[in-house]
């Protein structure tokens, strides 16, 4: 199958999946703003509310494109799993951008899925995946502890730590410095463009940048060279 035909099917599936994720994230953020708990029940309620005709059409069209790709052997099991992981990352990024929360109902299943796929022989070696999950969480936990000691309050949420742990489970430990570098540079650039000289005082959610860097890592490999 030529790359042109692959793109013709993959891009519509990606766009339709993005529409579905945006709809779910909007409904979830609305419920959180209304006082709902940040838990799996609220997320499930948002999923049910999003199951309208538009959402079902988007999901059906995306599934049809994926099935065609599988039948034409243009999408293997690992690529299919990573596509699903990218959808979850997109949903997490949209939720964090709206209500500054990364729900455990998404980050923890994402991490366990990466570990289980690694154990099944898909993705990095099990030892690398386990080390990546541990390193991702512990590194950001350590950075946050230093920030608390220095400034007297936390600099990031536990959801960021769990998201990096999930990315470590999918990518292994080696690409994590690259993911963090790309996410940090992206966040710094957005802060400077938005607030200028006051950027160092601003706060913005880190989840969207982590999700974007992790998504590029899943789709295209390393973001930058590991030694750098």
Regions found by a protein language model. Name each.
Residues 1-228:
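A membrane-topology feature that recognizes alpha-helical transmembrane segments
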């Amino acid at each position: 199958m030529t790359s042109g035909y692959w793109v013709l099917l993959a891009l519509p599936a990606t766009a339709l999946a993005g529409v579905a994720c945006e709809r779910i994230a909007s409904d979830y953020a609305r419920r959180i703003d209304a006082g709902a708990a940040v838990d799996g029940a609220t997320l499930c309620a948002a999923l049910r509310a999003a199951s309208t005709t538009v959402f079902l059409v988007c999901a059906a069209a995306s599934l049809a494109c994926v099935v065609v790709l599988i039948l034409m052997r243009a999408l293997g099991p690992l690529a299919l799993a990573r596509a699903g992981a990218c959808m979850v990352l997109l949903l997490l990024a949209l939720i964090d951008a709206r209500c500054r929360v990364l729900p455990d109902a998404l980050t923890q299943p994402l991490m366990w899925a990466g570990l289980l796929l690694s154990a099944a022989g898909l993705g990095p070696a099990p030892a690398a995946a386990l080390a990546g999950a541990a390193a991702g969480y512990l590194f950001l936990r350590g950075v946050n502890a230093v920030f608390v000691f220095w400034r007297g309050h936390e600099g990031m949420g536990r959801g960021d730590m769990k998201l990096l742990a999930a990315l470590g489970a999918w990518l292994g430990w080696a690409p994590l410095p690259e993911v963090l570098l790309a996410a940090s540079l992206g966040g710094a650039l957005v802060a400077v463009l938005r607030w200028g000289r006051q950027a160092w005082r601003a706060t913005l959610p880190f989840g969207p940048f982590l999700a974007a860097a992790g998504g590029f890592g899943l789709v295209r490999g390393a973001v930058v060279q590991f030694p750098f």
